[in-house]
From Swiss-Prot:
It comes from the Bacteria. Pfam families: Acyltransferase (PF01553). Belongs to the 1-acyl-sn-glycerol-3-phosphate acyltransferase family. OlsA subfamily. This is Lyso-ornithine lipid O-acyltransferase. Residues 258-292 are annotated as: Disordered. One of its GO terms (biological process) is lipid metabolic process. GO terms for cellular component: membrane. The keyword Coiled coil does not apply.
Length: 292
């Protein structure tokens, strides 16, 4: 009963915040005003708070532009998490437009929709992503092309990395920076989340969106770690397959280390640089002391 009361309250609060911010965002998109880039970040921070997503950030977002972020994909929650951390736009499948709730949110965030089955439109879509990169927008790409179980990185597809190549001629420095990042669901209710419980956070796609959303609302208190890795410079001499291989290697390493409780810096014997969007969350060391 208490869980359903929480679901209802969270839903009402999120609707109220949306009714305030959405008309402003629509106006900013229509008039091409600067707040269109950062307003979604505030909405997503509220959404993460209400859903019980506690986000910790490790490392730093690369300050150089153009910047393409390449991340592993576990769930629709990844969108909320990354959007609460930085002012980003996403590359999404065209059918996301028709999703309840999230389709509208994707359009309001000015996502780039691609039709992967329509090969003849691929060039136009890649050029659109390249133009957005050249305009200074931070574009997020999920190169796996689907969601995983949260325990591993699936094979990544190289085709959309062509967006980096298309933005190279428009870059003032002739370089596009491709930064890997890993999204790891590591805790639930303050306790470490093992492989067995990670499906609570993951959305593999064979479960309906609305039932999974309600399940997350009932559960709450999920801990998420976002690790930013070292960027790869993509210039006119770069090999797309080699860049995608290197990016995949770095994402896989960060994800594996985080799920095993090791940070990249700790593995190198360096202090771990971490900033938290939720300062009340215990550190990895504190949680390990609390764990049975």
């Amino acid at each position: 009963m208490i869980n359903w009361v929480r679901v209802a309250l969270c839903g009402m609060l999120l609707v109220m915040v949306s009714l305030v911010l959405m008309p402003v965002q629509i106006l900013c998109l229509w008039l091409d005003l600067k707040p269109r880039r950062w307003l979604p970040r505030h909405w997503h921070r509220v959404a993460c708070l209400l859903l019980g997503l506690r986000v910790r950030v490790h490392g730093e977002l690369d300050r150089r532009r153009p910047l393409l972020l390449s991340a592993n994909h576990v769930s629709w929650k990844d969108i909320l998490v990354l959007s609460s951390v930085a002012d980003v736009v996403f590359v999404a499948k065209s059918d996301v437009k028709s999703w309840p709730i999230f389709g509208l949110l994707a359009r309001l965030q000015a996502s780039v929709f691609v039709e992967r089955e329509q090969k003849r439109t691929t060039g136009h879509q890649v050029n659109d992503i390249g133009r957005r990169l050249a305009d200074g927008e931070i574009v997020v790409l999920f190169p796996e092309g689907t969601t995983s179980d949260g325990n591993r990185l699936l094979d990544i597809k190289t085709s959309l990395f062509g967006a980096a190549a298309s933005a190279v001629p428009q870059s003032p420095t002739g370089v596009v920076h491709v930064q890997p990042l890993a999204i790891s669901y590591t805790g639930i209710h303050g306790m470490p989340m093992g492989r067995y419980h990670r499906p609570i956070a993951a959305w593999p796609g064979d479960i309906g969106l609305v039932p999974h959303l309600l399940g997350v609302l009932r559960e709450g208190a999920l801990e998420v770690d976002v690790d930013f890795g070292e960027a790869v410079d993509y210039d006119r001499h770069a090999n797309r397959k080699e860049v995608s291989r290197l990016i995949g290697q770095r994402i896989r390493k960060m994800l594996s280390d985080r799920l095993r409780g090791r940070s990249r810096s700790a593995a190198k014997g360096e202090p771990a640089p971490a900033c938290s969007a939720a300062p009340d969350i215990p550190s990895d060391a504190q949680r390990s002391r609390l764990a049975p």
